[in-house]
Structures are given as structure tokens and as C-alpha cells.
């Protein structure tokens, strides 16, 4: 029978000092026999996805206490990628994921907590906490802050839905008036919550449902809706039961590595491909799998991407549907239901409720369940009122979207495309692979050939795009923006957005060893591995070189002879210590970022630390 970790600090005369300090936090004699459960919050006033979380940790803690546990809350940092975008702040975004994972490990191990409830929401916070959960392998339940309501505005006598990306595109479009741009800006992000499309934050929160570590509804139920409160209460109640299953019943199936196992990771990736999720999810799933010592790699993702259809199309791939519409159609469980009926899922998986996949679908799939309470939960909709408060409204749709032929979620037979929403491409310029969000690529751009326009930084590329130096047919190559080369693997949302603003969104491609925001669409290929700073071929591309992109056949090739590439490599390596570094780029890089770069692996490994350099 496993021993409660917390007994290390609460039992025995030699722990009198520790108990004295525990008493100073409010614990009593009765508490020293109970499980100590960490409530890992991420409240901050910097991030709309987290601005409403201040009191939600207390809500979870009270339920833990009522269920027989001891709750101790602490906070992690949280970076808003949208606010950090387009300037030096974005260098810190991906490295913050490692800091979050480490800080959770530090706090939980230093104080010998028995289990965790992770209150996450936005881009790097959910992955960082997921990495920590699989690293620690103690009972955990995730409950996120929930999606933002979609913005709405009236243009040309028509009400349209908006999100952050619309504000960015219009802000850079010279043909849009200042008044119209300001109107869109004020309407795009109306409430607290993670940005309303299938961007990185919402993608990861959906994947946590598929991994089995979050409760049904977690990925899609709006942050503002009163129903979301029940998820927090249930998380507090169920974590105590989950903890006791492991420590008092020796039930190892309660541990995250046994819930989020290889089969669950495959299901999560299948979901991601089917819903056209953010390309960042590939990076984060690979990183989390390494923390959990799970054999899940780019090879698995490539295999899955070839057989999974695109069943759910959401912003930024369409303006018609946002997360509130996904929820109305049945949320994550609704998509999983269609994938299961298509015979694409591993059924031998479970979740934190102890339910297997069949039981979960019977209880929560709106196409199967007879539970009116579940149907009512999925009818939860937006109020259209600007607010930063959680659970502030109780509006409902008059009916669910169960149209699986032309609705938000489709059956395999009526899929948006029989090819999934993500693809892994291989070729000489990406020997270890690269990623494209095919859900956002125009059908006419699935094969593309064009001359390279090479830039040593995102900033240089943005200046060229807005300055008219990029023309239709070009392949914009942005290099030395990978985990080491950036450092920090910046998101390239501004270059892709500005290509659209300049009317080039469907006539240019973009290739980078950096990454993209979940809000990116168009022929945007990222995560090129190996990166330029690691000697990758992308570092040898010259202006005018032709690049062939073939998404249907999963290929990407730099059309330059082997002899010429060998000569270029010899020339580059002759620079010695200055080899494989950006030419003429001026960028202030702090010691903290340099430390990250020293240990970072390329994107095909999840951009995690190179354990071989740490003796691991």
C-alpha cells in the first residue's frame, strides 16, 4: 500500500517543526491524517483567460475540505501570448512552460503534497502543468478557466462573429478605416476566458478531456456560464476520491501516467487532427509524453494524420464556428463520439471519473445520452455582455446542434475533409519533420512551389511584408527562430496575419523553424526540424531557391543539388563559433533565455530540455 507523501512532514516526533509550521497555516491535529492536496492556480490580471481565476481556487479548496482532504493553494506564472506577440516578449512564452512545470514540481515535492487540482487555461500554462503532472505522477484533475465568448459586431448590416485574429488583420489592413478597425478591436474579445477560437489554449484544454485528466465539458463550456462552477466543485470532490483510490486502495489506475497512457495520447492526437487544433499541441503533447516516459513521437503523429478526417471546423479556419458552437454541438465528447463510431479511437482508456470510453460516451455524448442534465449543460451559451467575472450568466441555446451532416461537428461520411486538420511533412529541409495546420490551408494551396525570400528574424520578415517586398508566389522563410536560435521559438502570428492584410494569404507560403499561434491559418509550415541553430538545412536556404510543398504526399523539398548544399554547409561551418547563427540580427537575449537555449531540443522532441546534457 503506498504511503501518503504528506506523512513525511506530518507524522513522527522528528517532524514537530514541520507540524508547527503547518499549524500556522491553519491545520489542526485532525488534519494530519488527511491527504494534502495542492490547488495549483494560475490567476493573474495580465491574462484575460486567467483574470477570473482568483476566487476559483478557493472554490475548489472548500470542496476538497468538505470531501475530507486538506487543500493548500499556490500560484504559477502565466504569459499572455497575444500581448507578448510581435515583440521581444514572445521570446519568453515557450520557456515559461518549463518554468511552470518546474515550479509545480518544486512546490509539490518540497511540501510533499499527495495530489493536485490544476487550474489552468491559456497557452503555456496547461502544457506546463500537464508536464509537471506526468513528471510527478500523483493523482491530478485539471479544470480550466474556460473559453471566452466570441465577439460580435455589425458590418454591412450583418452581424459577424469575431476573435483576436480579426482585430489583428484589420489593424494592419490599409484598406480598413480607423473607425472600422477600432470597432472590431473593441468587439473582438468581450469577456474573460481563453480566446474564442480553436487556438492553442482551447485546443490543449480539449485534449486534456481526451487524455482523461479533465472532466467532460472542460474544453468547451464558456468561462462566463454558471454551469462551469459545477466543474470546479466536481474537481474538488473527485480529487479526494481519486487520491484515496491510490493511497488507500493501492489502485495505480488513479495515477496520471496510467490514465494518460500511450492509447490516451493517441486518442488526444486523433481528436486534435479531427478538430484542426493548434500546431502547438504537437509540441506540447511530445513534451508531456517525454515527462511521462510515454513512447509517443512524431512518427505516431504522422501515422495518425494520414487516417483521421477533419470532423470539426472552428475559427480561425472558419468565421462561422467558435468554441461556444462546438459546445452546443456536444463539445469534446461529441467529437470523440463521432470518431469512435468511425472506428478510430482506442477504447481501452479511462478518465479521472473511473469511466472507460464506452461509459463516458454513453453518459456524455449528446447523440447517445438520455440524461437531460447533460443535454442542458451542452446547451449553455453566450450572453453577449462584456464581463471579467466567471459564472456571471445562465443563457442557453433553445436547441442543441445535432446536425452531423452540415453542423459544427460532422460524421466521417460528411467530414469537412477526409484528410485531417494537421499534417507532418518530411523532406531534405525538414529531415526530422515539420507541421502544417491543413485545416486552415486553401485547397488550391495544398501543393505549392515558389522562390524563397529568406529572413533571419520575425521582425525582418514583418518589415518586408508590410513594405511590399514579398509578392505572390513567394515562400517566406523565417529562420533562427527555433528553441535554440530564437531563443524561445517565437510564434509567427504577425507575419501570417500581415500576409492576409496585404492580400497574400492564399498566394504565399511561410516556412519557419519557429512556431505559430493557434490563431494562424494559411499555408504556414512550422517546427522545421532540425532548426537552423542546430545545423538544419533551413539555415542553408538562399533567396531565390525554389521550395516544393506537397501536403497530400506529406513532402517538402528544397530544390537545390546535394553538391551545392554540401558546399554551402562547408562555407557555413568555416565561420567556427559564429556558424549556424543569424547574420546581422540585433537582439537582446537575457541570461535566463540563454540558459533555456543551452538545454533546448528541436521541435520534433517537443523543445524540452536535452536530458543527455543533464546526465539523464
Swiss-Prot record:
Q: Which cofactor does it need?
A: [2Fe-2S] cluster; Mg(2+)
GO CC terms of this entry: cytosol
Q: How is the cofactor bound?
A: Binds 1 [2Fe-2S] cluster per subunit. This cluster acts as a Lewis acid cofactor.
**UniProt: Mg(2+) binding residues:** 81, 123-124, 491
Any one GO MF term held by the record is: hydro-lyase activity
Q: Record's PANTHER family?
A: D-XYLONATE DEHYDRATASE (PTHR43661), D-XYLONATE DEHYDRATASE YAGF-RELATED (PTHR43661:SF3)
The protein's name in its UniProt record: Dihydroxy-acid dehydratase
Amino acid at each position: 500500500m503506498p504511503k501518503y507523501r504528506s506523512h513525511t512532514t506530518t507524522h513522527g516526533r522528528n517532524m514537530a517543526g514541520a507540524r508547527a509550521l503547518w499549524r500556522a497555516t491553519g491545520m489542526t491535529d485532525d488534519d494530519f491524517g488527511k491527504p494534502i492536496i495542492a490547488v495549483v492556480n494560475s490567476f493573474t490580471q495580465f491574462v484575460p483567460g486567467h483574470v477570473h481565476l482568483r476566487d476559483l481556487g478557493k472554490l475548489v479548496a472548500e470542496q476538497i475540505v468538505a470531501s475530507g482532504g486538506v487543500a493548500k493553494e499556490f500560484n504559477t506564472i502565466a504569459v499572455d501570448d497575444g500581448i507578448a506577440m510581435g515583440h521581444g516578449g514572445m521570446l519568453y512564452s515557450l520557456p515559461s512552460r518549463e518554468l511552470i512545470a518546474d515550479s509545480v514540481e518544486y512546490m509539490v515535492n518540497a511540501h510533499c503534497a499527495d495530489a493536485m487540482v490544476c487550474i489552468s487555461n491559456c497557452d503555456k500554462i496547461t502544457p506546463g502543468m500537464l508536464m509537471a503532472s506526468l513528471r510527478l505522477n500523483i493523482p491530478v484533475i485539471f479544470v480550466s478557466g474556460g473559453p471566452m465568448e466570441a465577439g460580435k459586431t455589425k458590418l454591412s448590416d450583418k452581424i459577424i462573429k469575431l476573435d483576436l485574429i480579426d482585430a489583428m488583420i484589420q489593424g494592419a489592413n490599409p484598406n480598413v478605416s480607423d473607425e472600422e478597425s477600432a470597432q472590431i478591436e473593441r468587439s473582438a474579445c468581450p469577456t474573460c476566458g481563453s480566446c474564442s477560437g480553436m487556438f492553442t489554449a482551447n485546443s490543449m484544454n480539449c485534449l486534456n478531456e481526451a487524455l482523461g485528466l479533465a472532466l467532460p465539458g472542460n474544453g468547451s463550456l464558456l468561462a462566463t456560464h454558471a454551469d462551469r462552477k459545477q466543474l470546479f466543485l466536481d474537481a474538488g470532490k473527485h480529487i479526494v476520491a481519486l487520491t484515496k483510490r491510490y493511497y488507500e486502495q493501492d489502485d495505480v489506475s488513479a495515477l496520471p501516467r496510467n490514465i494518460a497512457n500511450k492509447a490516451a495520447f493517441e486518442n488526444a492526437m486523433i481528436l486534435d487532427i479531427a478538430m484542426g487544433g493548434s500546431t502547438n499541441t504537437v509540441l506540447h503533447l511530445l513534451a508531456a509524453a517525454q515527462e511521462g516516459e510515454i513512447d509517443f513521437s512524431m512518427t505516431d503523429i504522422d501515422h495518425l494524420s494520414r487516417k483521421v478526417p477533419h470532423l470539426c471546423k472552428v475559427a480561425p479556419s472558419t468565421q462561422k464556428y467558435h468554441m461556444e458552437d462546438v459546445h452546443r454541438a456536444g463539445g469534446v465528447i461529441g467529437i470523440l463520439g463521432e470518431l469512435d463510431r468511425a472506428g478510430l479511437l482506442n477504447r481501452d482508456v479511462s478518465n479521472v471519473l473511473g469511466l472507460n470510453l464506452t461509459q463516458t460516451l454513453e453518459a456524455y455524448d449528446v447523440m447517445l445520452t438520455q440524461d437531460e442534465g447533460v443535454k442542458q449543460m451542452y446547451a449553455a451559451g453566450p450572453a453577449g455582455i462584456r464581463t471579467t467575472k466567471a459564472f456571471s450568466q445562465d443563457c442557453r441555446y433553445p436547441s442543441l446542434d445535432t446536425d452531423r451532416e452540415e453542423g459544427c461537428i460532422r460524421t466521417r461520411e460528411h467530414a469537412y475533409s477526409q484528410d485531417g486538420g494537421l499534417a507532418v511533412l518530411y523532406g531534405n529541409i525538414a529531415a526530422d519533420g515539420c507541421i502544417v495546420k491543413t485545416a486552415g490551408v486553401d485547397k488550391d494551396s495544398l501543393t505549392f512551389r515558389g522562390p524563397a525570400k529568406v529572413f533571419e528574424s520575425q521582425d525582418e520578415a514583418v518589415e518586408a511584408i508590410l513594405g511590399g517586398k514579398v509578392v505572390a508566389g513567394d515562400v517566406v522563410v523565417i529562420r533562427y527562430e527555433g528553441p535554440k536560435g530564437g531563443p524561445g521559438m517565437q510564434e509567427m502570428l504577425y507575419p501570417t496575419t500581415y500576409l492576409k492584410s496585404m492580400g497574400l494569404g492564399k498566394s504565399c507560403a511561410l516556412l519557419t523553424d519557429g512556431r505559430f499561434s493557434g490563431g494562424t491559418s494559411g499555408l504556414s509550415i512550422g517546427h522545421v526540424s532540425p532548426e537552423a541553430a542546430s545545423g538544419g538545412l533551413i539555415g542553408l536556404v538562399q533567396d531565390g531557391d525554389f521550395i516544393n510543398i506537397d501536403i497530400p504526399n506529406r513532402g517538402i523539398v528544397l530544390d537545390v543539388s546535394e553538391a551545392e548544399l554540401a558546399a554551402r554547409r562547408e562555407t557555413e561551418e568555416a565561420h567556427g563559433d559564429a556558424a549556424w547563427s543569424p547574420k546581422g540580427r540585433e537582439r537582446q537575449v537575457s541570461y535566463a533565455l540563454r540558459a533555456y537555449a543551452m538545454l533546448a531540443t528541436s521541435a520534433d522532441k517537443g523543445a524540452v530540455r536535452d536530458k543527455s546534457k543533464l546526465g539523464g
